[in-house]
Regions:
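Generic multipass alpha-helical transmembrane bundles of integral membrane proteins
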Residues: 15-131
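Alpha-helical transmembrane segments and their helix-entry boundary regions
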Residues: 11, 59, 63, 156-160
């Protein structure tokens, strides 16, 4: 009976918040669309990259990802109607998706690098997860950074946000494109300007790691 009540309470709370989250996501999506329509593709890349690192799997992260899958669908529809893959409007869709993925790959990699080069900033348990974070980051699984963000949000989240934002900005600046909705390094063969894309990913990850090394306090 207690379990039933708890489950019922959880469902009520979740249902109460779902409309609010839906409104927020709709607002974010509309704002991102407006930026894209205005032609500010590098600004869009920066925002999308940063959104992937704010809550790492939460509503803001998911809003950015859903926007990305939505523009991929839009690109497919435009091509079906006669547009060419190289048309600017189609390319803008692929550029947005590339910025989203690189932004989501930065937090785990940046944290793993920080664990490697600034070990005094992390507990033994945290340092032990660096290999899994390398794997998760390379696979575009941002959630590997969540335990670190939960343990020290005031220091970790700003670092991952800045690094991911820079990566998204550079990816868009380099006009890197991605036609796949997921896959990490396993879909790099489909990325437009792959070497520049790797550079954007590396720069964002290093920025995250260095910032963590500078502002995170030593573990006692």
């Amino acid at each position: 009976e207690i379990t039933t009540r708890l489950v019922g309470s959880e469902m009520c709370i979740r249902d109460s918040f779902n409309p609010l989250i839906g409104l927020i996501n709709t607002g974010l999506s509309n704002g991102l669309t407006a930026i894209s329509d205005a032609g500010y593709i590098t600004v869009l890349g920066l925002i999308l990259g940063a959104m992937m690192a704010i809550d790492m799997g939460g509503p803001i992260n998911k809003a950015a990802y859903v926007f990305g899958t939505g523009v991929l669908a839009t690109a497919s529809q435009m091509i079906e109607k006669g547009a060419q893959p190289g048309d600017p409007a189609v390319q803008a869709c692929y550029i947005a998706m590339a910025a989203i993925m690189v932004g989501g790959m930065v937090p785990p990699i940046g944290i793993a690098l920080a664990c490697q080069f600034f070990p005094k900033k992390f507990t033994k348990e945290e340092r032990g997860s660096k290999v899994s974070n390398f794997v998760m980051g390379a696979s575009f699984i941002t959630e590997g950074a969540i335990p670190f963000a939960a343990a020290d949000p005031l220091h970790v989240i700003p670092c991952t946000l800045i690094g991911a934002g820079v990566a998204g900005f550079l990816s868009a600046l380099f006009k890197c494109t991605l036609m796949a909705p997921h896959g990490g390094i396993f879909v790099f063969a489909t990325v437009g300007h792959p070497l520049l894309y790797i550079l954007a990913w590396a720069v964002g990850s290093v920025i995250t790691a260095v910032l963590l090394g500078l502002i995170k306090k030593d573990v006692k």
